[in-house]
């Protein structure tokens, strides 16, 4: 689970430190120690975008049966209003959570988060250098494909340049098909003289599927079937897309040092009419407007 970092201002500040593989020096006992020079770091700041879904409830919606309500329940408009309020809060929270998950996946897969919406078109760039693209017959499924060799090389590359032990691989839909269909993978898995791993797919909660385990490199294999509705890339033709691109392979650690930062939420407090700043990951509000009478339910977040 990624713990949230709640910021008390609208700006989030990030310090980026690049590690290395230096070792402590040998010294003579009478000469004393040798300084291990500290690495530098870069500080970056960013104003997180506003995520602000809302819903509107009017009087006529409360006079008729809600979806799923018994035909003869006898619920009053006031009771329907209370139930609808809870359902609206849950809907807005789910939509915001999906947006946060999409942001996290974009950061992991591409190293960038495109912020595209009404009045905003920006990119958060984490400066990733650990992206590899296979081409031609070297692509998985090609005549020169070396799937197990690729996974071993990429694991070593992360260990050397990223200073982390990756122990999980997440395969996109097409990458998973190519992995299972690869003759070398099938041959190694069928070798009874060597334990190179086990393929034993099973479903896990929330769209996750465990595929199996490799012993060299030491990787647990997973697939993730979650999708999202993209209505901003091409508004004329919105489409449902997989969170994990079909041809992607993600190598990741099961113990990552990740952080989810949130900027502060500022709003006008209805009772006092004053501006208020709240240090929170979610700001849920409900207020009334007239002409016509309606209740506004909104969620504000700055992930």
PLM ranges: what are they?
Residues 1-8, 13:
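Single conserved hydrophobic/aromatic residue that forms the stacking wall/gate
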Residues 131-133, 275-276:
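Short acidic (Asp/Glu) and glycine-rich catalytic loops that position anionic groups and cofactors
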């Amino acid at each position: 689970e990624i713990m949230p970092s709640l910021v008390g201002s609208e700006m989030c500040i990030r310090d980026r430190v690049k590690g290395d593989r230096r070792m402590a020096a040998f010294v003579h006992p009478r000469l004393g120690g040798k300084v291990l020079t500290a690495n530098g770091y870069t500080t970056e700041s960013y104003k997180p975008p506003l995520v602000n879904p809302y819903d509107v409830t009017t009087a006529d919606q409360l006079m008729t049966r809600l979806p799923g309500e018994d035909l003869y329940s006898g619920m009053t408009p006031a009771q329907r209003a209370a139930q609808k309020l809870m359902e609206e809060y849950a809907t807005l929270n789910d939509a915001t959570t999906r947006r946060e998950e999409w942001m996290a996946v974009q950061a992991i897969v591409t190293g960038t988060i495109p912020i595209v919406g009404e009045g905003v078109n920006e990119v958060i760039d984490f400066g990733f250098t650990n992206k590899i693209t296979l081409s031609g017959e070297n692509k998985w499924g090609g005549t020169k494909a070396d799937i197990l060799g690729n996974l071993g090389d990429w694991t070593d590359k992360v260990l050397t340049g990223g200073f982390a032990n990756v122990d999980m691989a997440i395969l996109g839909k097409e990458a998973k098909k190519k992995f299972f269909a690869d003759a070398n993978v099938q041959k190694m898995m069928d070798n009874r003289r060597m334990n190179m791993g086990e393929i034993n797919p099973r479903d896990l909660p929330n769209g996750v599927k465990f595929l199996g385990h490799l012993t060299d490199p030491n990787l647990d294999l997973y697939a993730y079937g979650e999708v999202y509705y993209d209505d901003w890339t091409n508004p004329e033709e919105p489409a449902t897309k997989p969170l994990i691109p079909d041809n992607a392979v993600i190598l990741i650690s099961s113990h990552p040092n990740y952080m989810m930062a949130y900027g502060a939420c500022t709003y006008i407090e209805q009772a006092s009419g004053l501006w208020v700043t709240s240090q929170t990951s979610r700001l849920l509000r409900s207020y009334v407007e007239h002409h016509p009478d309606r209740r506004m339910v909104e969620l504000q977040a700055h992930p």
